Amino acid sequence: MAAATLLRATPRFSGLCASPTPFLQGRLRPLKAPASPFLCRGLAVEAKKTYVRDKPHVNVGTIGHVDHGKTTLTAAITKILAEGGGAKFKKYEEIDNAPEERARGITINAAHVEYSTAARHYAHTDCPGHADYVKNMITGTAPLDGCILVVAANDGPMPQTREHLLLAKQIGVEHVVVYVNKADAVQDSEMVELVELEIRELLTEFGYKGEETPVIVGSALCALEQRDPELGVKSVQKLLDAVDTYIPVPTRDLEKPFLLPVESVYSIPGRGTVVTGTLERGILKKGDECELLGHNKNIRTVVTGIEMFHKSLERAEAGDNLGALVRGLKREDLRRGLVMVKPGSIQPHQKVEAQVYILSKEEGGRHKPFVSHFMPVMFSLTWDMACRVILPPGKELAMPGEDLKLSLILRQPMILEKGQRFTLRDGNKTIGTGLVTDVPAMTEEDKNIKWS
């Protein structure tokens, strides 16, 4: 279990996990991609504004069970900050903007908004809570520097509360602030106190500092409707203060060659194709040559424009949620899961050795052990790929709750390097979390593995 703690506590590798990038609305047409409300309508015409980097940039997001009020809270934050010029108010309907989301009343794809407090500039990801859309939630949490866990006071922690916390911890999100929502629906203050106690115990269970974590009680709906100031506006202001102070500004790796996992691909009439994502490391400039790798593709092109939240950038830095206009490509040429890199800086790999923690039944993992050649799906960066697990010589079974060294062979070569985190899923269960320790060459035996 000590090794499991190590895997969960290791800081997120700088070349990992990008998320949906909020930038294209209006006439832009996504290609098999999540709704990404924040990138740039402005790429269709010349951008009118330039992004000014005058505050530290931090990526945060709302996580939690379906219908606990994540999107309502996101809307309330923008409404309150808009009054001081720190945001543009985004209504609930603008955040949940995909037709299926509106029809079902739930968030399916991670959506994004931008806002600023007095101290910081934030890109905020509103992650889906419904169990059917955990895959999109994994992508949503991947680039986050910290999370706001939303728990309804009238429900307490629920199944997706646990799963979201588990996924956030697995991909290296180390700081969580809690908002106990819908407090206006609970008359008994003791019930709210019990919910807070249960949340702190849950945080501790998943390796967070449960006793130290800020917990703010309030009502996002009251804040949106500007009633009951103590539970409404003041609670959201307290939450923002807690996010400012408890979630640290991360150290960004600006020295290594740029790496941008592609979250979405869009076509802009009259201009071309845009890829969106969070720059995981390095600096990306207008005019840079780049390669797009993965999924058996190797495409070379040039970045002809960069935008973030409808503002143009001459250069993007690690941590920025951006859209990059690429020369001479059609949206059909590209897909989510590709990785944009400096030419020659990295190559896809099909085999890795890794330290892997297999989740126990109590942690939501498998009930039974598995053998060599078991085939889960590996999630890393913005891609997912079927893989074969090869147990060490002499090892017949991998048991739930066990920490061990494994070899994993992917169905197709993808971007993988030492220190990279990944998650293993089997059906609708997260079954393991791992860290790449080596990237060996494929043997003849490896090449003959059957995938049917």
Swiss-Prot record:
Residues 64-71 are annotated as: G1. It is found in: Mitochondrion. One of its GO terms (cellular component) is synapse. The keyword Protein biosynthesis applies. It comes from the Eukaryota. One of its GO terms (biological process) is translational elongation. One of its GO terms (molecular function) is GTP binding. Residues 219-221 are annotated as: G5. The modification Phosphoserine is found at residue 312. Residues 105-109 are annotated as: G2. Residues 126-129 are annotated as: G3. Its EC number is 3.6.5.3. The modification N6-succinyllysine is found at residues 88, 234, 286. Residues 1-43 form a transit peptide. It catalyses: GTP + H2O = GDP + phosphate + H(+). It is an enzyme of class 3 (hydrolase). Residues 181-184 are annotated as: G4. Mg(2+) binds at residue 71. Keywords: Acetylation, Elongation factor, GTP-binding, Hydrolase, Magnesium, Metal-binding, Mitochondrion, Nucleotide-binding, Phosphoprotein, Protein biosynthesis, Transit peptide. Pfam families: GTP_EFTU, GTP_EFTU_D2, GTP_EFTU_D3. The keyword GTP-binding applies. Interacts with NLRX1. Interacts with ATG16L1. This is Elongation factor Tu, mitochondrial. It comes from Rattus norvegicus (Rat). The gene is Tufm.
